[in-house]
Amino acid sequence: MNALRYGLTPKMKPVSPRKSALVAALDVGSSKVVCMIARLRPHAPQQVLTRRSHGIELVGFGHTVARGMKAGCVANLGQAEGAIRHAVDAAERMAGVEIESVVLSLSAGRLCSELFAAEIDIVGSAVSEHDIARVLAAGSRHSLRDGRAILHSLPVGYSIDGVGGVRDPRGMLASRFGVDMHVATTDIAAARNLMLAVERCHLEVEAMVASPYVAGLAVLADDEADLGAAVVDMGAGTTTLAAFLGGRLVHTDGFALGGHHVTMDIARGLNARVADAERIKTLYGSVMCGGSDERDMITVPPLSDDERDQAQLVSRATLVSIIKPRVEEILEMVRDRLANCPLAPDARSHVILTGGGSQLTGLPDLAARILGRQVRIGRPLGIAGAPDVIKGSAFAVAAGLLVYPQAAHLEHFEARRKRQLMMGTGGYFARVGLWLRESF
């Protein structure tokens, strides 16, 4: 929690490519809380997932209905704590271990991205690890804004004497060495309260990670991440997105619309209980009408407990007419947010949908029409021992949290003491001025 005082979310030490590790993932969403415990074992690179240094064997799994959460934010601390304890306890019992820390996802807090560039002098010598650390520090030092916390600080690419496109600059001769840095941030209040709920369960937050980023780590093959793809995680209370290009995260965004809003539309449109609306959405939800939808009828239980009230019958076509407008609204917002990606259109050449909201029948076709891109449903890759229930798109974020320790080495964060110097009272532009004076 102390790190958030300086605008930093916790970051974990990368897992050694030569050592095994036990990792616990915690995905606290608006509709469900999921805890997964896995053993990471070093293995030879695979053909599809060449960037993964470890195999992932799931040994523990627990999930429960989320309580005290709204749009990914903590709304009731005690209820959220209780749900987290329940999911963690189930996973620990299955794994036969007691965990002390978790890798935690975050989908709330108005996720957003910014790109920064910086250059330093090398004076004609070869680029060293120290030079890389210097230029990364210069690129990230001025990225904090009041009320925001850094989730990710990732180099997008390097330049040597003004020539970009350099992936690995080590050992190259240069006079000027530059970096393009992608920084993803969130509202500090959303991060702080979610961490507090976890810490009240006597668990340390080892790392906090943006939900769409880890969803991408779970469902993208290496070629997709290299050539450019956008992952859209459609949760209950939020829809978040992440764009990948050149194997790197280059953009994140999110907004507070999701599957729960579809459920509420059904409840209002059919005059049904929320629980019945959720069940109807799960069993019959679709965004495309079929030839028999006008004739196929769905039973809707009465809203009250009065025995005199009778269940009503509605057609599948009526249900589609309620669901489709809201889903179109969500997809149109996704389209507009992706259009703002500075590296568009390369980073969104095709779209992968994850999350519980992606399970509506006909959604890939509707999304392809609205987004103007190839669309598929993303499912976690390379998780051994996973039961069928968690092989679907609804568990992509939790599965990606198990992959994240293998990608943690890509991130840059300054020492906490240095970062604290940038948190004075001068505001954002004053900090930029200070960065300019220090770096040039």
Language-model features: where?
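Nucleotide/phosphate-binding catalytic cleft detector across ATP-hydrolyzing
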Residues: 1-230, 248-249, 259, 272-320, ...
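Glycine-rich beta-strand-to-loop/alpha-helix junction loops that act as flexible
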Residues: 104-109, 349-359
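Short glycine/threonine-rich loop-to-helix capping motif typified by GTGT followed
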Residues: 221-223, 356-370, 391-392
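A structural feature that tracks compact, well-ordered secondary-structure segments
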Residues: 240-242
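ATP-binding/phosphotransfer module of carbohydrate and carboxylate kinases, centering on a glycine-rich
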Residues: 332-350, 360-377, 406-411
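Hydrophobic, well-ordered secondary-structure elements that form the walls
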Residues: 334, 353, 401
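Hydrophobic multi-pass inner-membrane translocation pores used for secretion
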Residues: 346-349, 379, 392, 398
